[in-house]
Amino acid sequence: MQTAIIDYGMGNLHSVLKSVRTAGQLAGKNTKIFLSGDPDRVSRADKVIFPGQGAMPDCMAALTRGGLDEAVKDALKNKPFFGICVGAQLLFDHSEEGNTDGLGWFGGKVRRFARDLRDPQGCRLKVPHMGWNTVRQTQNHPLFQGIPQNTRFYFVHSYYFAPENPETILGESDYPSPFACIVGKDNVFATQFHTEKSHDAGLTMLKNFLNW
């Protein structure tokens, strides 16, 4: 089995690679895990992981420039697919960041947190939302196996998912209001938080993906 981590020059790629390889050892899988910016090699992989970090317009431009956008669209149709952070945001129709069109796998938009964001006590909250936060699993999913409800994951983001179809929401967090932080449809699973930075919980989720 081969698992491709898409390398389009945008993302914490070597951290992702290290985490996925550790997850592969935990899963006991005889799988080749590799970085690739080659559309043909991505198309031959059995599973695909799509990380991303930085501004969505830059990420979309880099993806298209490398000819990887079509490889991603093809993988979304029929391979187990895991989007992480901006890689997950790119799967939506549109983002308010730079008024950027995405790949359109999930209907809906990526919206920015309010600039004057306050908690229930009226204290101002920083944007980006950065640090550990609990995640509520709103539906059952194979990638949640062994992960308790309200487990903490690591976030760094100023924009959040706003899916058209609430049935695609698999997990939520609060900042301070609830927002979707995990979405899924068919063979595709995507998280706003950084799975590769989320210690044991992140490794368990990646292990579950390799077993999916």
UniProtKB/Swiss-Prot annotation:
Residues 2-212 form the Glutamine amidotransferase type-1 domain. GO terms for biological process: L-histidine biosynthetic process. It catalyses: 5-[(5-phospho-1-deoxy-D-ribulos-1-ylimino)methylamino]-1-(5-phospho-beta-D-ribosyl)imidazole-4-carboxamide + L-glutamine = D-erythro-1-(imidazol-4-yl)glycerol 3-phosphate + 5-amino-1-(5-phospho-beta-D-ribosyl)imidazole-4-carboxamide + L-glutamate + H(+); L-glutamine + H2O = L-glutamate + NH4(+). Keywords: Amino-acid biosynthesis, Cytoplasm, Glutamine amidotransferase, Histidine biosynthesis, Hydrolase, Lyase. Its main location: cytoplasm. The active site is at C85, H194, E196. Its EC number is 4.3.2.10, 3.5.1.2. GO terms for cellular component: cytoplasm. PROSITE patterns: GATASE_TYPE_1. The keyword Cytoplasm applies. Pathway: Amino-acid biosynthesis; L-histidine biosynthesis; L-histidine from 5-phospho-alpha-D-ribose 1-diphosphate: step 5/9. One of its GO terms (molecular function) is lyase activity. The keyword Cell cycle does not apply. Heterodimer of HisH and HisF. IGPS catalyzes the conversion of PRFAR and glutamine to IGP, AICAR and glutamate. The HisH subunit catalyzes the hydrolysis of glutamine to glutamate and ammonia as part of the synthesis of IGP and AICAR. The resulting ammonia molecule is channeled to the active site of HisF. This is Imidazole glycerol phosphate synthase subunit HisH.
